[in-house]
């Protein structure tokens, strides 16, 4: 009971004391009670000031101070970002993302970040070429000789001209050049070999006009097409007529 009595008296005294202190300023002018309140302020100065321990900086020494040149060149709105000085080796392994493949070969000691990993080079479709690796051709000498022999086989001049090409091809990337230098549909003249010309002359002297069967046989023997044999005989007859006209005029 004594404890409860002391507590109740303490609360009552505190309420009464605060009301008694706050009441005079409300009833009377502030000038009369200005001086008595000053000792109260002096009493509060006796208490020791609160001292807080300084906290460690969040980022530490990793953030370097801004250089005056960078701050002067850029406006005040944009703050230049400076890369941290150096991250510990233990933290660097956690900076790697799971998408980045780990390098297979480690850099030599002393090179540091200057070491560059050799990237594969793209060659033909389905092939990867690395730097510093020699290229080997799968074609042997026997295979090359076989290809050359196949190219030399047959008559070199007996090829049928299937299309004409200009002597100077225009630039394929320039449409105006393609339009100005359009290729003509006329085919090139295919010269006959001496053997073919001799055999055709013999056949012409024997008969100026060939039947279809004979023309097919001559084309097969001379490795020509029936159309080539037919055109050659037509040109030969026109040439003979021209020669006869010139001889008649003389």
From Swiss-Prot:
Alphabetic keyword roster: Developmental protein, DNA-binding, Homeobox, Isopeptide bond, Nucleus, Phosphoprotein, Transcription, Transcription regulation, Ubl conjugation
Protein's organism: Mus musculus (Mouse)
Keyword Ubl conjugation part of the UniProt annotation: yes
Subcellular location: Nucleus
Gene label: Hoxb9
Protein name: Homeobox protein Hox-B9
Bias type Basic and acidic residues, positions: 160-171
Location of the DNA-binding region in this protein: 185-244
Entry function: Sequence-specific transcription factor which is part of a developmental regulatory system that provides cells with specific positional identities on the anterior-posterior axis.
